[in-house]
């Protein structure tokens, strides 16, 4: 994979002007499948994300990789080993912005581990919602033990995606989670919250998840541009 990216990067740099998001290079290994105004997208990301919050990202790649598939579910972006990989299969500029913000959120988890997870309050908020959801589900096919696990679990993910379905969960969990995908794991609860703090209905997020909201507020407002 790395040799493929390096070879493609040389060819890409010959054809395209080097792009950046806050001085982090953004490399087009594969062109977007749809007519995406990526320069406008990158400019918007720079406006809404303080530069100090991309310190853990070394490079952005637009490229196809195997990791965009997990358990027969497709993803459009991935943060791994200091790089954010972006699928060229983006429906719109809005989808691309969502994906970038979401993966930047994941890039912050190690640096801000104590602030996000250290006191356990965010996990308690998340699992409290999971337990409430369990009692709302009509004849759940998994036990409470599964709902009380904050980590990603393939069996639980399939239960959410296949047994219950996101449409059902969207209706059932509207008063608990900002979106059904936030139910997946504590890490996704964090990333969905960060994404929608910046792009969604901030007041709704605060009402639904006050602990999550306050963690995000603190990290963003204590970043160097806001200090």
What are these regions (language model features)?
Residues 3-28, 64, 73, 204-227:
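C-terminal or late-domain output modules
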Residues 97, 103-123:
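Catalytic Zn2+-binding segment of zinc metalloproteases
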Residues 126-165:
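Low-complexity, serine/threonine/proline-enriched polar segments
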Residues 13-97, 118, 128, 135-146:
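Auxiliary, metal-adjacent structural segments of Zn-dependent hydrolase domains
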């Amino acid at each position: 994979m790395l040799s493929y990216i390096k070879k493609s990067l040389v060819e890409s740099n010959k054809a395209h002007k080097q792009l950046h998001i806050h001085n982090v290079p953004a490399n087009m290994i594969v062109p977007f499948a749809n007519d995406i105004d990526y320069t406008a997208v990158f400019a918007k990301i720079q406006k809404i994300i303080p530069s100090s919050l991309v310190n853990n990202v070394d490079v952005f790649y637009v490229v196809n990789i195997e990791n965009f598939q997990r358990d027969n579910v497709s993803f459009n972006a991935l943060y791994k080993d200091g790089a954010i990989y972006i699928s060229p299969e983006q429906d719109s500029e809005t989808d691309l912005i969502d994906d970038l913000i979401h993966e930047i959120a994941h890039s912050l988890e190690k640096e801000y581990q104590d602030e996000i997870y250290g006191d356990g309050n965010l996990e308690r908020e998340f699992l409290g919602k999971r337990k409430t959801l369990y009692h709302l589900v009509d004849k759940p096919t998994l036990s409470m033990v599964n709902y009380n696990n904050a980590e990603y679990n393939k069996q639980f993910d399939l239960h959410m995606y296949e047994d219950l379905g996101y449409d059902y969960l969207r209706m059932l969990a509207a008063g608990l989670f900002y979106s059904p995908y936030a139910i997946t794991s504590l890490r996704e609860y964090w990333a969905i919250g960060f994404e929608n703090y910046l792009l969604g209905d901030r007041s709704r997020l605060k009402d639904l998840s006050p602990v999550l909201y306050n963690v995000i507020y603190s990290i963003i407002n204590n970043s160097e541009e806001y200090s």
